[in-house]
């Protein structure tokens, strides 16, 4: 299974590292700034564009700060959703508003992509601990 992870900030970077530690080594990562991507590449992940993640991954995970960013990444021009294949799964770990989640879900359903709204909390220490 190939996993894509978008958003490598305070929570996302340790979450992605935990996927690698758990044996999910076919992990593609993306972030606006390149430093966390490079850190995860050194740990075994592969840096990728959002388009590559959409095209290649069976599961796409986002951990982004807010609703507008998740909508832009998924539904914006050349967004991840436009490249996802039927049967893929999108897991949003961001804390976004329900209206945005429903909008993203509706668009993904048109493509045969499933969505799991799975916001996380606990801050960096809990993300590191897994």
Residue ranges and their predicted role:
Residues 29, 49, 92, 115-117:
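Hydrophobic residues in well-ordered beta-strands that form the structural core
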Residues 24, 85-88, 111-113:
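A short helix->loop->beta-strand "cap" motif at the edges of active sites that frequently abuts
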Residues 40, 48-100:
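Rossmann-like NAD(P)-binding element
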Residues 3, 96-130:
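Rossmann-fold dinucleotide-binding core
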Residues 39-43, 83, 103-107, 111:
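Alpha-helical structural signal in soluble globular domains
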Residues 17, 21, 75, 106:
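Short, well-ordered alpha-helices that flank and scaffold nucleotide-derived cofactor binding pockets
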Residues 1-62, 124-127:
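NAD(P)+-binding Rossmann beta1-loop-alpha1 motif at the extreme N-terminus of oxidoreductases
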